[in-house]
Amino acid sequence: KEGMLVSSAAAGPAFEGGQLSCGTGSIPGAVRDVRIQYGLVRYETIGRKPPVGICGSGLVSAISEMRKSRMMDNTGRLSLRYASRGLEIIPGKIVITQADIREYQKARAAIRAGLEILVENAGYRMEEIEALELAGGFGSQLDIAKAAGAGLIPEKLAERVHILGNAVIAGLCVYIQSPDQEGIRRMIQHTREIFLANQPKFTKSFLDFSHF
């Protein structure tokens, strides 16, 4: 179909580290990947630098592993063993608390509800989507299998994800170098924004996706 639909979901603070107890942006030293095996926690930082906090991709990775290890239930509630102290990535320094998980659940619910509504407004079903493109620092660090495991993206789309990197800069370069800048401007003019707050189904979808 001609034109584009766009929307936005209020999920940035959780994935940018701003609302996390030990959060940080996707900078050198940020914990980007977490693995849990037999109760032991291992991690990897960006640039293999000394750990300074956990970024959005690290949170997604940790929650996927915590779900797999049955450290939380389908409501996101931590098991009794971890309820008070959370999951310690680095004891005494970097921890994922119950409050952090709740922040993730809100962000995840906003994204999944927004995606469902956007696809529905376009007249498609989720299984008909050919590609899911992720951009930015958060997307470039994300483990797609773990993003599906943490419920951030639909499992049926996991194999169709494309990582774009810094799409803003790439897009500007394309525009500057394009011989058809007017055509690009016309494409932008045919873009329609979907305001999620005005969508009757948003609240129900948000609540549905709040649980795993």
Describe each PLM feature range:
Residues 1-212:
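Helical "lid/coupling" subdomains associated with nucleotide-phosphate turnover
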